[in-house]
């Protein structure tokens, strides 16, 4: 019998509002929300919390979807895994390799799901690209360009404090390309970044050789 998992959504981010909640409702997935900033009733949520710790204690959820600012991903992910929840984290899952390795060790030890959420790979253009590559296995070079509209001045994407910037926002896409399209072993990489006056990365170029 297929289990109907309950999801606790921690954080009421743009992606949560625009994509996650409507998907949960459409797919009839039981979910509740923990948000410190949003107090109004959220359609479809079986329960709402204004405190993350209370939500983790009382939600009755099986899976946590973490959708907080980048700088908060690691400490909350570590806590959530230690409490025994399966965990999905908005990209980037962490901002440092050492932090990621810690989370992986905890998840393996406790036999829990730990994954980073990306959405771009479900776009119709990627379905087309995968189909195209499947018919042309002699491809030697792939050029990919990810761009987004300029964020608003108060956006967390432009916040040094919350570990924003282009690299944190877009590098999970870059890292996922090979896994999605080729599944080859990485042999060499080089990265060039451009920073603004606040030392925030605003663009970057990556060369990956497989």
Language model features with spans:
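Beta-loop-alpha module in the N-terminal Rossmann-like domain of NAD(P)-dependent dehydrogenases
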Residues: 46-88, 92-106
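Residue-level detector of anion-binding/catalytic polar loops
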Residues: 30, 86, 113
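Contiguous beta-strand/loop segments that form the cofactor/metal-binding neighborhood of enzyme cores
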Residues: 1, 169, 175-210
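Predominantly a Rossmann-like dinucleotide-binding segment in NAD(P)-dependent oxidoreductases
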Residues: 120-187
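Rossmann-fold dehydrogenase core element
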Residues: 101-119, 137-144
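Short, Asp-centered acidic motifs that coordinate Mg2+ and/or phosphate
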Residues: 31-32, 62-63, 141
């Amino acid at each position: 019998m297929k289990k109907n998992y309950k999801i606790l959504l921690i954080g009421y981010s743009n992606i949560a509002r625009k994509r996650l909640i409507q998907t949960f409702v459409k797919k009839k997935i039981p979910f509740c929300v923990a948000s410190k900033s949003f107090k109004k009733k959220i359609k479809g949520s079986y329960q709402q919390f204004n405190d993350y710790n209370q939500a983790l204690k009382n939600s009755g959820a099986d899976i946590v979807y973490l959708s907080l600012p980048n700088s908060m991903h690691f400490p909350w992910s570590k806590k959530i895994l230690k409490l025994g929840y399966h965990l999905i984290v908005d990209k980037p899952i962490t901002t440092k390799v050492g932090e990621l390795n810690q989370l992986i060790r905890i998840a393996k030890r406790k036999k829990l799901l730990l994954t980073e959420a990306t959405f771009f790979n479900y776009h119709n253009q990627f379905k087309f690209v995968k189909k195209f590559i499947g018919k042309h296995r002699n491809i030697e070079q792939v050029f990919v360009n990810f761009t987004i509209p300029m964020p608003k001045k108060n956006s967390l994407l432009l916040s040094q404090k919350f570990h924003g910037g282009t690299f944190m926002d877009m590098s999970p896409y870059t890292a996922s390309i090979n896994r999605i399209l080729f599944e080859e072993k990485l042999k060499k990489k080089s990265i060039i970044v451009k920073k603004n006056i606040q030392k925030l990365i605003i663009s970057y170029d990556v060369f990956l050789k497989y």
